[in-house]
Protein backbone atom coordinates (compact mmCIF):
# COMPACT_ATOMS: atom_id res chain seq x y z
CA UNK A 1 0.00 0.00 0.00
CA UNK A 2 2.83 2.36 0.92
CA UNK A 3 4.69 1.63 -2.32
CA UNK A 4 1.52 2.32 -4.34
CA UNK A 5 1.05 5.64 -2.57
CA UNK A 6 4.72 6.48 -3.14
CA UNK A 7 4.33 5.73 -6.85
CA UNK A 8 1.26 7.95 -7.00
CA UNK A 9 3.10 10.76 -5.23
CA UNK A 10 6.16 10.52 -7.48
CA UNK A 11 4.02 10.40 -10.59
CA UNK A 12 1.93 13.36 -9.45
CA UNK A 13 5.06 15.40 -8.67
CA UNK A 14 6.59 14.59 -12.05
CA UNK A 15 3.36 15.47 -13.82
CA UNK A 16 3.06 18.68 -11.82
CA UNK A 17 6.62 19.69 -12.66
CA UNK A 18 6.11 19.16 -16.37
CA UNK A 19 2.70 20.90 -16.34
CA UNK A 20 4.07 23.93 -14.49
CA UNK A 21 6.91 24.26 -16.98
CA UNK A 22 4.54 23.83 -19.90
CA UNK A 23 2.03 26.35 -18.57
CA UNK A 24 4.79 28.88 -17.89
CA UNK A 25 5.73 28.83 -21.56
CA UNK A 26 8.82 26.65 -21.40
CA UNK A 27 9.56 24.86 -24.67
CA UNK A 28 12.37 22.70 -23.28
CA UNK A 29 14.69 23.97 -26.03
CA UNK A 30 12.74 22.19 -28.77
CA UNK A 31 11.10 24.09 -31.61
CA UNK A 32 7.94 22.20 -32.53
CA UNK A 33 6.48 22.32 -36.07
CA UNK A 34 3.42 24.45 -36.78
CA UNK A 35 1.53 21.36 -37.98
CA UNK A 36 -0.20 20.14 -34.81
CA UNK A 37 -0.12 16.57 -36.11
CA UNK A 38 3.69 16.64 -36.12
CA UNK A 39 4.11 17.87 -32.55
CA UNK A 40 6.41 15.50 -30.61
CA UNK A 41 5.71 15.03 -26.86
CA UNK A 42 8.67 15.77 -24.61
CA UNK A 43 7.04 14.48 -21.45
CA UNK A 44 7.50 10.71 -20.91
CA UNK A 45 4.27 8.73 -20.58
CA UNK A 46 5.18 7.72 -17.02
CA UNK A 47 5.08 11.38 -15.97
CA UNK A 48 1.57 11.83 -17.35
CA UNK A 49 -1.15 11.33 -14.74
CA UNK A 50 -3.44 8.43 -15.73
CA UNK A 51 -1.94 8.43 -19.20
CA UNK A 52 -3.64 5.28 -20.50
CA UNK A 53 -7.07 6.50 -19.34
CA UNK A 54 -6.72 9.77 -21.24
CA UNK A 55 -5.28 8.41 -24.45
CA UNK A 56 -8.10 6.45 -26.02
CA UNK A 57 -10.50 7.03 -28.92
CA UNK A 58 -13.98 8.39 -28.30
CA UNK A 59 -16.38 5.44 -28.84
CA UNK A 60 -18.36 6.02 -32.03
CA UNK A 61 -21.05 3.48 -31.14
CA UNK A 62 -22.05 5.14 -27.86
CA UNK A 63 -24.87 7.72 -27.95
CA UNK A 64 -23.62 10.90 -26.25
CA UNK A 65 -25.34 12.36 -23.20
CA UNK A 66 -26.37 16.00 -23.69
CA UNK A 67 -25.02 18.22 -20.90
CA UNK A 68 -23.91 21.80 -20.22
CA UNK A 69 -20.74 23.22 -18.72
CA UNK A 70 -22.68 23.87 -15.52
CA UNK A 71 -23.38 20.14 -15.22
CA UNK A 72 -19.66 19.33 -15.31
CA UNK A 73 -18.98 22.00 -12.69
CA UNK A 74 -21.48 20.26 -10.40
CA UNK A 75 -19.97 16.77 -10.66
CA UNK A 76 -18.64 15.57 -7.25
CA UNK A 77 -14.85 15.55 -6.99
CA UNK A 78 -12.80 12.93 -5.15
CA UNK A 79 -11.02 14.50 -2.14
CA UNK A 80 -7.77 12.61 -2.87
CA UNK A 81 -6.09 11.99 -6.23
CA UNK A 82 -6.96 8.72 -7.90
CA UNK A 83 -4.07 6.25 -8.36
CA UNK A 84 -1.79 7.23 -11.22
CA UNK A 85 -2.74 4.04 -13.08
CA UNK A 86 -6.46 4.18 -12.28
CA UNK A 87 -8.53 2.95 -15.27
CA UNK A 88 -11.74 4.64 -16.31
CA UNK A 89 -14.80 3.91 -14.19
CA UNK A 90 -18.35 5.20 -13.75
CA UNK A 91 -18.94 8.59 -15.40
CA UNK A 92 -15.60 8.37 -17.18
CA UNK A 93 -16.96 5.59 -19.39
CA UNK A 94 -19.63 7.88 -20.86
CA UNK A 95 -19.54 10.13 -23.91
CA UNK A 96 -20.92 13.65 -23.51
CA UNK A 97 -21.99 16.36 -25.95
CA UNK A 98 -22.22 20.08 -25.29
CA UNK A 99 -24.28 21.91 -27.89
CA UNK A 100 -23.66 25.36 -26.43
CA UNK A 101 -20.43 26.45 -24.76
CA UNK A 102 -17.78 29.15 -25.18
CA UNK A 103 -14.06 28.79 -25.82
CA UNK A 104 -12.08 31.18 -23.63
CA UNK A 105 -8.48 29.97 -23.90
CA UNK A 106 -6.49 27.47 -25.91
CA UNK A 107 -2.86 26.44 -26.22
CA UNK A 108 -0.70 23.46 -27.10
CA UNK A 109 0.81 21.83 -24.02
CA UNK A 110 4.55 21.92 -24.67
CA UNK A 111 5.10 18.76 -22.61
CA UNK A 112 2.60 16.31 -24.12
CA UNK A 113 1.39 18.17 -27.25
CA UNK A 114 -2.29 17.92 -26.25
CA UNK A 115 -4.46 20.86 -27.32
CA UNK A 116 -5.61 22.44 -24.06
CA UNK A 117 -8.86 24.44 -24.05
CA UNK A 118 -10.87 26.21 -21.38
CA UNK A 119 -14.62 26.49 -21.91
CA UNK A 120 -17.45 28.19 -20.03
CA UNK A 121 -21.23 28.24 -20.14
CA UNK A 122 -21.36 31.93 -21.05
CA UNK A 123 -19.07 34.33 -22.91
CA UNK A 124 -18.26 36.21 -19.70
CA UNK A 125 -14.49 36.19 -19.15
CA UNK A 126 -15.03 35.70 -15.42
CA UNK A 127 -17.37 32.71 -15.82
CA UNK A 128 -16.19 29.44 -14.23
CA UNK A 129 -14.40 27.19 -16.67
CA UNK A 130 -13.83 23.54 -17.48
CA UNK A 131 -10.75 22.16 -19.21
CA UNK A 132 -11.14 20.00 -22.31
CA UNK A 133 -8.26 18.47 -24.27
CA UNK A 134 -7.74 17.01 -27.72
CA UNK A 135 -4.91 14.47 -27.42
CA UNK A 136 -1.81 14.16 -29.57
CA UNK A 137 -2.82 10.65 -30.68
CA UNK A 138 -3.00 10.07 -34.44
CA UNK A 139 -6.76 9.42 -34.49
CA UNK A 140 -7.27 13.04 -33.38
CA UNK A 141 -5.02 14.55 -36.08
CA UNK A 142 -7.91 15.88 -38.21
CA UNK A 143 -9.67 17.22 -35.11
CA UNK A 144 -6.53 19.14 -34.10
CA UNK A 145 -6.11 20.55 -37.60
CA UNK A 146 -9.76 21.60 -37.60
CA UNK A 147 -9.31 23.53 -34.35
CA UNK A 148 -6.29 25.29 -35.81
CA UNK A 149 -8.06 26.15 -39.07
CA UNK A 150 -11.24 27.38 -37.40
CA UNK A 151 -9.28 29.61 -35.03
CA UNK A 152 -7.34 31.03 -37.97
CA UNK A 153 -10.66 32.17 -39.44
CA UNK A 154 -11.04 34.23 -36.27
CA UNK A 155 -7.51 35.66 -36.66
CA UNK A 156 -6.18 33.58 -33.76
CA UNK A 157 -3.00 31.59 -34.24
CA UNK A 158 -2.65 28.24 -32.49
CA UNK A 159 0.50 26.12 -32.60
CA UNK A 160 3.17 25.01 -30.15
CA UNK A 161 4.50 28.57 -29.93
CA UNK A 162 1.25 30.54 -30.10
CA UNK A 163 -2.01 30.48 -28.16
CA UNK A 164 -3.45 31.73 -24.90
CA UNK A 165 -6.48 33.74 -23.86
CA UNK A 166 -8.83 34.63 -26.69
CA UNK A 167 -9.70 38.34 -27.01
CA UNK A 168 -13.38 37.36 -27.00
CA UNK A 169 -14.97 34.00 -26.26
CA UNK A 170 -16.06 31.92 -29.25
CA UNK A 171 -19.16 29.68 -29.33
CA UNK A 172 -18.44 26.01 -29.88
CA UNK A 173 -19.77 22.48 -29.59
CA UNK A 174 -17.90 19.71 -27.78
CA UNK A 175 -17.90 15.92 -27.90
CA UNK A 176 -15.81 14.04 -25.36
CA UNK A 177 -15.39 11.69 -22.44
CA UNK A 178 -15.34 12.69 -18.79
CA UNK A 179 -11.97 12.48 -17.04
CA UNK A 180 -11.14 13.24 -13.40
CA UNK A 181 -7.74 14.90 -13.11
CA UNK A 182 -6.07 15.91 -9.85
CA UNK A 183 -5.80 19.36 -8.28
CA UNK A 184 -2.71 21.14 -9.58
CA UNK A 185 -1.75 24.21 -11.59
CA UNK A 186 -3.39 23.35 -14.89
CA UNK A 187 -5.02 26.47 -16.26
CA UNK A 188 -6.34 29.93 -15.50
CA UNK A 189 -7.80 31.10 -12.21
CA UNK A 190 -11.28 30.62 -13.69
CA UNK A 191 -10.89 26.82 -13.96
CA UNK A 192 -13.31 25.61 -11.28
CA UNK A 193 -13.18 21.80 -11.30
CA UNK A 194 -10.73 18.94 -11.72
CA UNK A 195 -13.21 17.25 -14.06
CA UNK A 196 -12.38 17.52 -17.75
CA UNK A 197 -13.56 16.23 -21.07
CA UNK A 198 -10.47 14.33 -22.21
CA UNK A 199 -10.32 13.17 -24.94
CA UNK A 200 -12.54 15.72 -26.66
CA UNK A 201 -13.17 17.16 -30.11
CA UNK A 202 -14.69 20.55 -30.81
CA UNK A 203 -16.44 22.46 -33.54
CA UNK A 204 -15.97 26.22 -33.29
CA UNK A 205 -19.10 27.90 -34.62
CA UNK A 206 -18.97 30.76 -37.17
Predicted feature descriptions by range:
Residues 10-19:
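Bacterial N-terminal signal peptides
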Residues 1-9:
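Bacterial N-terminal signal peptides that target proteins for export
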Residues 23-206:
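OB-fold and OB-like single-stranded nucleic-acid-recognition modules
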Amino acid sequence: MKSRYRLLLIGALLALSFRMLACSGQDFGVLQPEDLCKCLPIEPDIADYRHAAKHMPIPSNMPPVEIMVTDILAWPQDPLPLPIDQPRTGRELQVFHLANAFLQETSVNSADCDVHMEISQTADKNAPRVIIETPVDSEFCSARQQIQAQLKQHNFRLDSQHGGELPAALPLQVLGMAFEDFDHSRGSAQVATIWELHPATVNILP
